[in-house]
């Protein structure tokens, strides 16, 4: 079995990504690995990457990522944060490559039909293009 030292866990502040982070923490504890929480985002067509708007947005996103991660018990597992500007699935795959991660753990909601056709699936694209194994963790909404 290939040892796992680094796990990339993409986050988008959704319950599905929180669920995936908990699974990534379980794997990290078992393998004594570190987690890189990656949030990839795109700018609007009206903002250049070097504009004040882009810098303000990055700072706002950084705070949101920190707040999101603060809600998840890590059990002492090191979690590093990375913000990536660009097409989400490409940035996730590139982050895994650059970090020499051995595993990507990401949430999915299992959308199908029109919703899947219109929005696509970041998880599906990561699975298709990543150089390392991708564990897709399906999130099922609790019934009320």
For every predicted segment, state its role:
Residues 54-66:
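Short, surface-exposed alpha-helical segments at coil->helix boundaries
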Residues 2-51, 55:
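Small/aliphatic-rich secondary-structure junction motif
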Residues 2, 23, 70-104, 142-144:
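Structural beta-alpha unit
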Residues 1-19, 75, 128-144:
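Intrinsically disordered or low-complexity boundary/linker segments at protein termini
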Residues 27, 31-34, 77, 101, ...:
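Short glycine/serine/threonine/alanine-rich loop segments
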Residues 38, 80-84, 135:
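General small-molecule cofactor/ligand-binding pocket signal
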Residues 41, 60, 83-87, 109:
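Short beta->alpha linker loops
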Residues 95-144:
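Gly/Ser-rich helix-loop-strand patches that form or flank binding pockets
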